[in-house]
Amino acid sequence: MQPQTTKYDQNASTNLDQDVNSSRLVKYAQNQTEIKEYLYAILSKEHPRLFEKYGPDFLAIDLAELLKDGEILCKLGSLLPASKVPNNPSTKFRSSKMPFVQMENISFFLSTCELVGLPHDEIFQTVDLYEAKDPYQVVITLMSFSRLANKIDASKFPHVVGARAARVKPNVPSKPFRLRTK
């Protein structure tokens, strides 16, 4: 009888968690430019000076670093119409260099996402962005937000980022034979 192998005996150079994390980081790198272009297209109309502090090539800045203070997220969330999001938390934005205020700004945007009905499993946690724990989850949230915001107000949110949600055709059962007319 052979001894049972343990995790210490394996010859694999990576484990499943590392593979998943590296896969998500690759997807993050692939999608962050599209997200930044979306944010610029939506926000530059209402807030033309918002991106000036990042310089002319803000597309070269990492998305997580760009969103870390919560300002861009709150400005995005505050564009939602008040009729659809009464008492919008994103309007409570405060500009600050203090970490707890920046994390609070991020949480204002996340509260707005919950209020508009974004699925809970598509909403990132504050540490996913602020500490860059899972930056791809931030991308997922912004993609989902873009789809939902487009449904709410297509005039302010004309663009959608990422794949469109599939519309499932409802399954209509056929009429039983005994009820069909002859």
Residue ranges and their predicted role:
Residues M1-K182:
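Alpha-helical coiled-coil scaffolding segments
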